[in-house]
UniProtKB/Swiss-Prot annotation:
Name of the molecule in the record: Gag-Pol polyprotein
Lineage of the species this protein comes from: Viruses, Riboviria, Pararnavirae, Artverviricota, Revtraviricetes
Catalytic activity: DNA(n) + a 2'-deoxyribonucleoside 5'-triphosphate = DNA(n+1) + diphosphate; Endohydrolysis of RNA in RNA/DNA hybrids. Three different cleavage modes: 1. sequence-specific internal cleavage of RNA. Human immunodeficiency virus type 1 and Moloney murine leukemia virus enzymes prefer to cleave the RNA strand one nucleotide away from the RNA-DNA junction. 2. RNA 5'-end directed cleavage 13-19 nucleotides from the RNA end. 3. DNA 3'-end directed cleavage 15-20 nucleotides away from the primer terminus; 3'-end directed exonucleolytic cleavage of viral RNA-DNA hybrid
Post-translational changes noted in the entry: Specific enzymatic cleavages by the viral protease yield mature proteins. The protease is released by autocatalytic cleavage. The polyprotein is cleaved during and after budding, this process is termed maturation.
Chain positions of all zinc fingers (CCHC-type): 368-385, 386-403
Intrachain disulfide bonds: none
Amino acid sequence: MKLSKLEKALKKVRVTPQRDDTYTIGNVLWAIRMCRLMGLDCCIDEATAAEVAILIGRFQSLDLQDSPLKGKDEKAILTTLKVLWSLLAGHHPENSDMAEKYWEAWTIRERESQKEEEGEITSIYPQLRKNFPAVSTSDGSPRYDPDLTKQLKIWADATEKHGVDHHAVNILGVITANLTQSEIRLLLQSTPQWRLDIQLIESKLNAREHAHRVWKESHPEAPKTDEIIGKGLTAAEQATLTTQECRDTYRQWVLEAALEVAQGKHDRPGPINIHQGPKEPYPEFVNKLVTALEGMAAPETTKQYLLDHLSVDHANEDCRAVLLPLGPSAPMERKLEACRAVGSSKQKMQFLAEAFAAINVKGDGEVQRCYGCGKPGHIRRDCKNQKCFKCGKPGHLQRNCKSKNREALLCPFWAEERIPSGEDFCDPVCSPVGIRLNRQPFIKIFLGGRWVRALIDTGADEVVLKDIHWDRIKGVPAASVVQVGVTGRNIARRKSNVEWRFKNRYGIVDVLFSNTPVNLLGRSVLQSIVTKFTLAAHTKQIQPLPVKLHGPGPRVPQWPLTLEKYKALKEIVEELLKDGKISRTPWDNPFNTPVFVIKKKGGSKWRMLMDFRALNKVTNKGQEFQIGLPYPPGIQQCEHITAIDIKDAYFTIPLDENFRQYTAFSVVPVNREGPLERYHWNVLPQGWVCSPAIYQTTTQEIIAEIKDRFPDIVLYQYMDDLLIGSDRPDHKRVVSEIREELGAYGFKTPEEKIQEEQVQWLGYELTPKRWRFQPRQIKIKKVVTVNELQQMIGNCVWVQPEVKIPLSPLSDLLKGKTDLKDKIKLTEEAIQCLETVNKRLKDPEWKERIKEGTELVVKIQLIPEGVVYDLLQDGNPIWGGVKGWDYNHANKIKKMLSIMKKLSRIVMIMTGREVSFLIPGDSEDWESALQRINTLTEIPEVKFYKHACRWTSVCGPVIERYPTYYTDGGKKGSKAAAAYWREGKIRREVFPGTNQQAELKAVLMALQDGPAKMNIITDSRYAFEGMREEPETWGREGLWKEIGEELRRKEYVGVSWVPGHKGIGGNTEVDQEVQKALQGPITVSLPQEILLEAGETKLVKTGIFWEGLRPCKLRPEEGLKLKGSLIDEELQLEITNTQNSRVGIRQGQTIGTCFIEAIPQAIEEHEKWHTTAEILAREFQLPRRVAREIVHRCQACKRTVSCPRRGTNPRERFLWQMDNTHLEGKIIWVAVETNSGLIEARVIPEESAQSIVFCILMLVYRYTVYHIHSDNGPCFIAQKVEALCKYLKITKTTGIPYNPQAQAIVERTHRDIKDKIAAFREDCETVEAALSLTLVALNKKRGGIGGHTPYEIYLESEYNKYQEQQNHYNNFKTEKWAYVRDKRKVWKGPYKVLWDGEGAAVVEENAMPTLYPHRHMRFIPPPNTDTQDGNL
């Protein structure tokens, strides 16, 4: 802000609210001057609010206890600065108090922002800890341990000079006497300057740990390895839970390892004792180091680690200065190239001469310059201003330099360098994770016209460079200053107004020059180029995958929640918002998805869920990459295994920014306390259909990188569970690096979820060599819900490889159950099945994993429900299960081949190898059965074991010379009948059962009565296929079991099938016998006692009202001379006494039998089409009472109640009413012909004019349409529909708006269609199929006017139209003549008829057309050509 504007703004601010005095520019200048007196620099010209805020903070941090400014002046200065800050920040305070409030509000916001940033870093990097000696208390919080601090100090003093030597080992034995395992590890890690010694100690400890794990397998009574090393336990738990023996063992391991390291360093020459001499060439030093490492007994990884670090740390001072910027992990070729010019003076000068040969080479037009001063006319060795290339000071050369500081000057002092651009800077300092602390934080900055590489030093106030840079840096020399540091007092030269540049930032700074070992970049520059320093690790960015919708986004409103659930949801949302997983959505986002919370199992915590069904419907779904769980036997054997769990896996992967708006949800307060709080997801939400596929795609790339980096490890991934196996001795290091790689992408792998050696993974327990199912128990309750029973069955199916029992007792209980809350009582068989499962899961057996080169065999055992199989390796089962029969195949061998094919596929997936089978029976029987199958494509390798199993069948094709039995069965009501027929021999049997049972009973009867060799012919496909499969006793139960036993006694049975009711001899006879058995006579008795005189006739009730039977004929009992017939309407029996004497009939006395006629056919017709009573009575000649009773007893027709018939409409031929209705989410177009009631309907995709146009075209080419009447719906009054009707010359009218009676006929039809669809819906898969059956029922099976169906009435209309057209055509085509009678009743003619209409005709009389009625005309055939007009 300019001074003029600032002065005007200050005049509007009062000093206090009570006074009218205002601030002036002089007050501000006084405050700035006072700050400068205290050493605080500030310039009022072009000052910003941020600079003033920094000035206020620095002023408040001053100690003014003994200063003359203490008191009123201090408060006046602070108040004036705060007023200045508020004006520069854009506020308009009226007085100083308001400026104070603005300042307090801003500081509070800054403090909260800083806390949020610190919380974010802590949540992303929870493993960050301060390096201090602390132990964990019982509640998990750290506290300082003063005793451990003393021991750390003793250990540091012991290893300060020579590292881990014999003296340090003795000290270590004393101070670790009472320490736990974690405290000993903390002690070792507290000496970072001797990290090579510690690395060797840890390598030897890992070797001892591995050896103990191997030894522990054969000595189970010994302590566990994890207990000895204290793995998975806190310091407090190690002190209380682990035994003293375990702690002493670990301490002994540490002392032995430390002693070996000390002996290797000091007893014999080793790599640790090799150092580069001051003038020794670097390649010679590296060769000696490699030779020493080759003779060292250590793993290759340890040797490589030592080579990388010793080649830098043990190099001389000159080489180390060059190698430190490269880092220890740089390739050895790069290190050798960098140190090529380091060594003797001759080598250094030769390198410089080669590097800058182009400067001293004289070319065309070029002037030779001195490399030292840059002046032309002489070279460097003749230069009078000699300067040292080592320290930069004049007066001596490099070979005579006594300074220990060295700066590599590869550019002449006088050379100009261009001003850099943003692309020249490669150090990402401005980002919070830009500076890596695994090496010294150097950056390259353009300072005073030169590139300078400086070390970031937050403890330095100013920029401090080496003295060598004094002549190179452009600036104004200023007075020297006194530096006070860790080395004491030092006088440094100073240059002011030095320009610096870094990326897109620049400024002016003072630079100090002193005898410093390294260039330092202090806070004077850092505060401008670095915003903050955070302890953050380097992370790799995950690119979100794009997602698209194929429809509109979800707009489902949020339903209300209880107060308890609202509070829980609010708490979860705040936590997610704090972690950055969700964000507040903009006000213009119209999409919404409902959200709710449920309680987690076994606790009071809540879990947030979202109903993504609407969003999932319109999301373009991808293909999930995870196709199933890995089989544990197929996991490769390893020496070490580790299981890792990824925490919040979905929440680590970002969601596509363009898609985030569709995941918006709302938090609605109770009683509408305030407005909605709207959020959307920034990461993958749970429950969204694409979250698994995106997660799998992302992690697949990361896992591929890890496998490429470690090709010798075994890595299994299932969603967020990882299993790592390897044979490496440094397995833990590999696991640590994999976790670091995952952490680089933001995936968290908590320590508490890491398992080693014996792990629980995906429901299994795994060791390096074996596996088993985790022990578990299924809770058994006598009464369960459908949902609970489904969960039980799912758990049992999961452990089938262990239990290997059929689950049919449990699955049979679910038949017919649709509601998940229905109660089911477990049967004894089901409870016994669950108890068997629990017994086998109490302590599952350990099984081996698949070994390379071993033979795999699948052994199959037969059970009634299917087969039990075991995958054998060296005779021991490693996998198994139960497979049920596939009844789609024709015989048993096809079923077995199908199961073997499935098992081969399972083993192929598990191992990638072929497998052989061990099945029951013998090879001859098996090969004989295979020869009968003509469609075999693949036969697996098979071996056999002894078992009573026959693969061939006695059933085959019919042989004519054997006797043939025709069988049939049927059912009526609850009664079933079975019969067989053979050359007039008949056997019938009636029993309660089903139709299939009747068919099987007939076959069983024929087998029982037939010879050893016979034929059976049936019209039942069920019985025919079952006979071909040969139902043995082990395969089926019930009638099939009895049939199988009978088949064992036969030598040969020919089986064939014929279609029923086709007049085939034998089948027709047996069918008639079954019908007779089902239609047997029904006895008739009277419900009350009657007395009949001789010749008397009475009407009595028969007592037969239902079962679909119509008594048609009455046969009296012997001794009764009665005559009877049925009265249709009343179902009464008219009985006449034909005897000469009185006859008395007691109550309940049987008077005769009635026989069935036509009723079964009527019932079958109604069950198919739900025909009306009028049509049944007409087609089957039934009494209307019986027909109505048939309809009344139909449950589907009971549910369909017709709507009341209100409203009338005009009815005429070929007038169609149209409308749309909705059912089950479908749109049904309906058209009804008003004269006949004929209905046409179809399902259309949408209510649009285009769909109505297609429907009208379909109606026109099927029926005659003169007139269309509809409502005022947009799709019916559209321009397309009107134009089509006009083109087809169809009259188009609409009804009265908002008056349903204008469409009364079609509205009634809507209800009729829905009722009929409801009746047919159970038998149809789709609405379209049910609609087709409905049209048949309503058009052809429903009585209308005069008892005719709508279809018949419409056909009559079409016939009448045809007759009219024919008459009209004949009137013009056929030549007619007629005699006519005039008014005088005189007949004249004949005249030619010009036109013949209805009731009258026009004749040509005397060359004039004359009209006569038909009653005055007599038509005659055309006369001959010579006929003349005349009078009769």
